[in-house]
Amino acid sequence: MAREPQRIKRRERKNITSGIAHVNASFNNTMVTITDAQGNAISWSSAGMMGFKGSRKSTPYAAQVAADDAGKKAAEHGVRTLEVEVKGPGSGRESALRALQAVGFTITAIRDVTPIPHNGVRPSKRRRV
């Protein structure tokens, strides 16, 4: 009657040499996703995932730690060269890029893909701090 223990499947190593790093830097958090050329995610990380809470998530250091984590996971799958796509107005844009270089990737292109409206919806009211 006793159930046999379930085997945990190990994630297979993808053998990919080049990829695209999508850095989404918002005002509240920074998310780094490394994909292959088709857009299938290889690894991802964020400042919140790395244990930063509240306003500390939006710091450049939190973005650096998140990019470092995502980069190390992608390097295990054999990624060597990256194109970087940066999106958003956050403070973690440059530090995430530097962290990816520090991991040891050769960065071939840096693109800013922040969506800019051609006068879209009305913005929210101004903050009074």
UniProtKB/Swiss-Prot annotation:
Native organism: Novosphingobium aromaticivorans (strain ATCC 700278 / DSM 12444 / CCUG 56034 / CIP 105152 / NBRC 16084 / F199)
Please give the NCBIfam families that the UniProt record associates with this protein.
Answer: PRK05309.1 (NF003698), uS11_bact (TIGR03632)
Pfam family of the protein (one): Ribosomal_S11
User: What is its biological role?
Assistant: Located on the platform of the 30S subunit, it bridges several disparate RNA helices of the 16S rRNA. Forms part of the Shine-Dalgarno cleft in the 70S ribosome.
Q: Which GO terms describe its molecular function?
A: rRNA binding; structural constituent of ribosome
Say which family it is in. Belongs to the universal ribosomal protein uS11 family.
Q: Name one GO cellular component term.
A: ribonucleoprotein complex
Q: Which gene encodes it?
A: rpsK
Q: Name one GO biological process term.
A: translation
Known partners and oligomeric status? Part of the 30S ribosomal subunit. Interacts with proteins S7 and S18. Binds to IF-3.
Q: Which UniProt keywords apply?
A: Ribonucleoprotein, Ribosomal protein, RNA-binding, rRNA-binding
Q: Which HAMAP family does its entry note?
A: Ribosomal_uS11 (MF_01310)
- What this protein is called in its record is Small ribosomal subunit protein uS11
Instruction: Tell me which InterPro entries the record gives.
Output: Ribosomal_uS11, Ribosomal_uS11_bac-type, Ribosomal_uS11_CS, Ribosomal_uS11_sf
